[in-house]
A protein has these predicted regions:
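Low-complexity Ser/Thr/Gly/Asn-rich repetitive segments
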Residues: 112, 214-215
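Functional-site microenvironments in short loops/helix caps that host divalent-cation chemistry
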Residues: 31, 40-198, 205-207
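Short glycine/proline-rich turn/loop motifs
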Residues: 10-34, 128, 193-198
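A short glycine-rich, aromatic-capped structural motif
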Residues: 1-17, 36-53, 97, 148, ...
Length: 216
C-alpha cells in the first residue's frame, strides 16, 4: 500500500519528505514490500492518512486550518484538534487513548497485548530490523503488531495524563513532541509494554517508528 499510494499521492498534490518500507541491518530498506513503513515523520504520517483516504474515495481527516477547507497535503503544519474532522470516514492516526485500548485487546490489567509474559514467539524485539507485518498472533481485538516490529505515531502531543479529559481524550492542545507507542524491533522487553510511552519531535524520522492508519 505504501509505495502504490505514495506514487498516486505525489501526482495529486502531496509531498512526502520521509518514509521507507522496512529496515534491515545497516539501515537500508527491506526487500519485502510487506514490512511496515518506517523512517517517516509525524507530518508525513498524517499526510499519508489523507492520501490513503482520497485514494480510496473516502473523506480526508486532516486540514490545514480550523475552517477545514484545505486538505493537508504538503509542508510542515502543526495541526490543532480543530483541524481534524473527527467524524470523517477516512483514515487518521489513533489518539494515544485509542491506541492503548486497541493494543490491550480487552485485557486492561496485563503488561502486553497477549498477557503478562513476553517470549520471542509473541513479537519482534531486540532484533536487527523489521519483519513482515502480521507475523505474530493477534490480540483479543484482532490487532496485530501492537508491540514490537515498528513503533507507531499517535495523534497526541505528549503530556501528563492528568491533563486529559475522561472520555475520548485527544491530548494536550499544544506541545513540542508527539506520542509514540508500541515499541519496535530494537527495543528491549520494557518498551513493548502496553503502558510504555515514548515521544519524538514530529519532524524526526528514524528506523524504528512507523504508523498505523485507523478509521471509523
Amino acid at each position: 500500500n505504501w509505495a502504490r499510494i505514495r506514487r498516486w499521492a505525489m501526482t495529486n498534490g502531496y509531498h512526502f519528505a520521509t518514509g521507507q518500507c522496512g529496515v534491515v541491518s545497516g539501515g537500508g530498506p527491506a526487500t519485502s514490500s510487506n514490512h511496515p513503513v518506517v523512517k517517516i515523520g509525524w507530518y508525513d504520517a498524517v499526510k499519508f492518512c489523507n492520501a490513503r483516504s482520497q485514494f480510496e474515495g473516502l473523506m480526508p481527516t486532516y486540514y490545514t486550518t480550523a475552517g477545514q477547507t484545505n486538505v493537508y497535503k504538503s509542508n510542515v503544519v502543526d495541526l490543532t484538534s480543530a483541524c481534524v474532522n473527527w467524524n470523517a470516514n477516512g483514515y487518521r492516526l489513533p489518539t494515544e487513548a485509542e491506541w492503548e485500548k486497541a493494543a490491550r485487546g480487552g485485557m486492561t490489567a496485563r503488561e502486553y497485548p497477549w498477557g503478562d509474559a513476553l517470549a520471542a514467539s509473541n513479537a519482534l524485539y531486540a532484533a536487527a530490523g523489521t519483519s513482515n507485518v502480521a507475523s505474530y498472533a493477534a490480540n483479543g481485538y484482532g490487532v496485530r503488531d501492537a508491540a514490537g516490529n515498528a513503533a507507531e505515531w499517535c495523534w497526541d502531543w505528549s503530556g501528563s495524563y492528568a491533563d486529559r479529559t475522561a472520555a475520548n481524550p485527544t491530548g494536550p492542545a499544544t506541545g513540542t513532541v508527539r506520542v509514540v507507542r508500541g515499541g519496535s524491533w530494537s527495543n528491549a522487553s520494557a518498551g513493548l509494554r502496553c503502558a510504555a510511552r515514548a515521544s519524538l519531535v514530529p519532524a524526526s524520522s528514524n528506523t524504528v517508528v512507523g504508523l498505523r492508519c485507523v478509521r471509523r
